[in-house]
Amino acid sequence: WPRGPDYTERRVMCGLQYVRAAISICGPNMQTMRPRNGSGPIVPPPDFLAMYGMARYKPPLSKKCCSTGCNREDFRGYCYL
């Protein structure tokens, strides 16, 4: 997939951890994002994606949940399935 010049340096604050290569960890496929309880609509947070330019990337799917306690209110409580 395409990589931006700062791909490996992009960071997303999740709880107290800075996650390197956050796009590959926290931004797999925005269409698969659901609330942590498994119900509700599949809704990517547009301003969060725009902030980190994630919409341009399509990294491999990841089952890692990186959003518990994220510092973005509209991103909190979401997991990637």
Curated annotation (Swiss-Prot):
It comes from the Eukaryota. It comes from Hypanus sabinus (Atlantic stingray). Belongs to the insulin family. Pfam families: Insulin. The keyword Glycoprotein applies. Heterodimer of a B chain and an A chain linked by two disulfide bonds. It is found in: Secreted. Keywords: Disulfide bond, Glycoprotein, Hormone, Secreted. InterPro entries: Insulin-like, Insulin-like_sf, Insulin_CS. GO terms for cellular component: extracellular region. Disulfide bonds join C14-C66, C26-C79, C65-C70. Uncertain. Glycans are attached at N37. This is Relaxin-like protein AGF. Gene3D superfamilies: Insulin-like. GO terms for molecular function: hormone activity. The keyword Disulfide bond applies.
